[in-house]
Amino acid sequence: MRYCPRCASPLVECGIAGRARLSCPDAACGYVFWDNPLPVLAGLVERDGLVVLARNHAWPEKMFGLVTGFMERGETPEEGVAREVQEELGLVTRSASLIGIYPFQRKNEIILAYHVVAEGEIALNEELAEFRLIPPEKLRPWDFGTGLAIRDWLARRSS
């Protein structure tokens, strides 16, 4: 963000509430860009005992991940993850339980990750290129973002 959304003045960096923040230099305006993290939903989707990993069209050929998306106004996180699973995979959510909350600082996001038990036939939407059904014991978590949720989910399953 380079300009004030209220008065169009160029934003400047200054110390506010103990941190460097972008703000409007016009004292009459007073706009501060707080740059708060955005909540993102992630679904570790299990269908018929297998985990669904999906590849976004924008991702490299061998890169697969969990279903993710943003909440809509007025929905609970559980409703939001069920909607994302329906929209992206065409599956109906039978249950959604919180795995955990994870930082994704590279994108200034907070991930709310859910274990979703779903049913139906997979029908990918236009965002996704392909999917894979993986037995849980073959999952290999990565060390950031939604990979941390996979790690925690696998640890709970084995205990």
How should these model regions be labeled?
Residues 102-123, 132, 136, 153-154:
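Active-site-adjacent beta-strand/loop module that shapes the phosphate/pyrophosphate-binding cleft
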Residues 137-143, 147-149, 153-159:
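Long C-terminal interaction/binding lobes of large macromolecular proteins
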Residues 46-87:
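Conserved Nudix-box catalytic region and its N-terminal flanking loop in Nudix hydrolases
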Residues 3, 23, 44, 53, ...:
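Conserved hydrophobic/aromatic beta-strand scaffold that supports enzyme active sites
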Residues 123-128, 142-145:
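Short, charged, solvent-exposed linker or helix-capping segments at domain edges/interfaces
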Residues 14-15, 92-100:
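A short coil-to-beta-strand element that immediately follows conserved catalytic motifs
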